[in-house]
Amino acid sequence: MKAAILVFPGINRDRDMARALRLISGSEPAMVWHAETSLPAGTDLVVVPGGFSYGDYLRCGAIAARAPVMDAVRDYAAKGGLVLGVCNGFQILCESGLLPGVLMRNAQLKFICRDVHLRVERSDTPFTRGYNAGQVIRVPVAHGEGNYEADEETIQRLEGEGRVLYRYCSAEGVVDEAANINGAAHSIAGIVNDKGNVLGMMPHPENHVEDIMGCTDGRGLFAGLAQHLEKAA
């Protein structure tokens, strides 16, 4: 796996992501500064990590979405390249037009930092093949603006096309208001674009890949990506 991790001013999860990718793939990811106008040759996965790019000024991800490197990411995605955006990365992908919708302030107007449960909705995508459909995983969240919203037509299209890959749920896999930590429409935690090659998700799977963290449920996402890329090579 030859991954490229984007680095913006204010991003603070780039090294967490690099460590996770290194542990799973055995390869050193490239760190790509926001002012670059191209991606490293041979890149097979672009990661937009979490943090607070540009201090979240204007809107979360709004400034980063207009950085020079994002033009290269849009071109890369248009050609079918895999793109993963986590937390602020999800916000950046929405602001850049690579994913529909917007991430709004959490319904309870509080920053949420804790482990949550997610239900994997399907297992036949590059981003979920490391899991089983219906599997419940535990991963951390750390966000103040994770409330995914879109117009009703967009939500229905996402649901109808099976583009909701991860959904907030209880430990038993029940999707209800009590388990919806931030008020997201349809308890949406992660979605893909219409081609299925761009994923945005609010939770942080990169922080649950080692035994020392008490949970390794995040490994499935990265292991699945590695398997997909190995098979495609």
Swiss-Prot record:
Pfam families: GATase_5. GO terms for molecular function: ATP binding; glutaminase activity; phosphoribosylformylglycinamidine synthase activity. Keywords: ATP-binding, Cytoplasm, Glutamine amidotransferase, Hydrolase, Ligase, Nucleotide-binding, Purine biosynthesis. Gene3D superfamilies: 3.40.50.880. Part of the FGAM synthase complex composed of 1 PurL, 1 PurQ and 2 PurS subunits. NCBIfam families: FGAM_synth_I (TIGR01737), PRK03619.1 (NF002957). Part of the phosphoribosylformylglycinamidine synthase complex involved in the purines biosynthetic pathway. Catalyzes the ATP-dependent conversion of formylglycinamide ribonucleotide (FGAR) and glutamine to yield formylglycinamidine ribonucleotide (FGAM) and glutamate. The FGAM synthase complex is composed of three subunits. PurQ produces an ammonia molecule by converting glutamine to glutamate. PurL transfers the ammonia molecule to FGAR to form FGAM in an ATP-dependent manner. This is Phosphoribosylformylglycinamidine synthase subunit PurQ.
